[in-house]
C-alpha cells in the first residue's frame, strides 16, 4: 500500500498526551497528531526521526499526522488506521494462504456485541470473521501485543470463539509493522488476560496469524508469516 499523501521527515521531541506530539520540522517546533493511542514508548524517543503525513482536512489544528518512526535503522509504522488497509490489500491479492478462497470482502461488520474488521464469504457463502491487530512492540527481533492493556482486544477474541462454535470461520491476524522480526507472542506482562484469551482461542480452533511487513518511506505491505509462540 503506497502512501497517497505528502510525506515529510521530522525530529521527535515529546508526546504530551496520547493524541499529540511535538516535532521539529524545517527548524520549527510543530504540534502534530498521533494516530495511535498505544504507548509506543520504545519507539517515540526524543531525537528519533519520524515520518509525517500531510492532513487532508482544511484548517486542522495539527496539519500533519505522525505515521512512522525510526528505531535505530528500522522504520516502524505506528498509524493505527494502516493495518486494516494493508490486510485488505493482502486479501484482495490472495497473500494469506488460508483465506484465498474468500472473494467477498466486507469491512467493519457486526456480530454479537462486537464489530469486526472483516467479514469474508466464499462462493459457497461460507462466512469468516477476521479481526486485525497492529503490532509495533519489538525487542531483539521478537514482537508482542498489546503494548497497553486492552479490554476491547480480549472481548474481540472471546467473540471470535463464539463465532467458531457456531460453525463459521474465525481468525485474528497480528500485523507486525516491521520487517526484521522472527517471532510473535502475546504480551502477558502487560495484559495477562489478553494472553489467556488468545491461548483459549487457539484451543477452540480460532485461526491465529502473524505477518511482518515491508515498511519503507513510500509504502507498507504484508510480507511473510512469523512464528507464533503462545
From Swiss-Prot:
CDD domains attached to this UniProt entry: SfsA-like_bacterial (cd22359)
GO MF term (any one): DNA binding
Pfam hit, one: SfsA
Source superkingdom: Bacteria
Family note: Belongs to the SfsA family.
Protein name from the UniProt record: Sugar fermentation stimulation protein homolog
Taxonomic source organism: Clostridium perfringens (strain ATCC 13124 / DSM 756 / JCM 1290 / NCIMB 6125 / NCTC 8237 / Type A)
Lineage: Bacteria, Bacillati, Bacillota, Clostridia, Eubacteriales
